[in-house]
């Protein structure tokens, strides 16, 4: 079946609800265009899932939200955070990433102790007081639901942790910088079901303090944890709505076919 990629439904939010917004976002890898006119608004203190087949543009889109594609892709359009376009050449990228953090698909702890994994960036940003560092380590590990498992082994190598623990450590490391927004690129795809459930539980708790945007291939996961869902296809955002509506009453036929498994 052929679909009209201009047939779209994109939910619009109230101005006060927005934590982040993209306007006419187009992304190119050389001459190949990977994203077409991406216009999305993300609500504060909610989880938004980005779904779609491999190569649909969702990870490319996610990485653009804190300029992780810089030097690899040509990004055109606006990404507005607190009313400021973070694509502006005047923006200090490293400073901006304190506010818009990233957790990658595979756990990537530093080959340092658990404690040093969290304090390394803090020290680089001028926090030297030992009591303050210890406080942030404890708070971050508690928010990532890891403190009780590692509190007596903070000097242990992070590489000795299980995969699920390593991923929660990476989440703790990211939130130690006190970001407003946390981007997660398939954070549970490399984990077993028990570790995945723990990550999902952690994310649901984190949205009380952070805005979360997550790429997932797992539609059941998207339906379980997200408030909003955006469906990507061939570099286009086809539908963006509240998750319940996406999964029970999609407005676009292409979305319906993808969700129901009748795609293609």
UniProtKB/Swiss-Prot annotation:
Q: Which residues form the ABC transporter domain?
A: 20-259
Main location, first listed in the record: membrane
InterPro entries in alphabetical order: AAA+_ATPase (IPR003593), ABC_transporter-like_ATP-bd (IPR003439), ABC_transporter-like_CS (IPR017871), P-loop_NTPase (IPR027417), PstB-like (IPR005670)
Recall the GO molecular function terms of this protein's record: ATP binding; ATP hydrolysis activity; ATPase-coupled phosphate ion transmembrane transporter activity
| GO cellular component assignments | plasma membrane
- Topology in membrane: Peripheral membrane protein
Tell me where the signal peptide lies.
none
SUPFAM superfamilies for the chain: P-loop containing nucleoside triphosphate hydrolases
Q: Where in the cell is it found?
A: Cell membrane
According to its UniProt entry, one GO biological process term is: phosphate ion transmembrane transport
> Which residues are listed for ATP binding in this entry?
52-59
State the reactions this protein catalyses. Answer: phosphate(out) + ATP + H2O = ADP + 2 phosphate(in) + H(+)
Claim: Cell membrane is one of the keywords in the record: yes
> Any idea which UniProt keywords this protein has?
ATP-binding, Cell membrane, Membrane, Nucleotide-binding, Phosphate transport, Translocase, Transport
Annotated EC: 7.3.2.1
| PANTHER family (alphabetical) | ABC TRANSPORTER I FAMILY MEMBER 17, PHOSPHATE IMPORT ATP-BINDING PROTEIN PSTB 2
Subunit info? Answer: The complex is composed of two ATP-binding proteins (PstB), two transmembrane proteins (PstC and PstA) and a solute-binding protein (PstS).
What the protein does comes down to: Part of the ABC transporter complex PstSACB involved in phosphate import. Responsible for energy coupling to the transport system.
Task: State the similarity comment.
Answer: Belongs to the ABC transporter superfamily. Phosphate importer (TC 3.A.1.7) family.
Q: Which named protein is this?
A: Phosphate import ATP-binding protein PstB 1
Gene source species: Ligilactobacillus salivarius (strain UCC118)
Top-level taxonomy: Bacteria, Bacillati, Bacillota, Bacilli, Lactobacillales
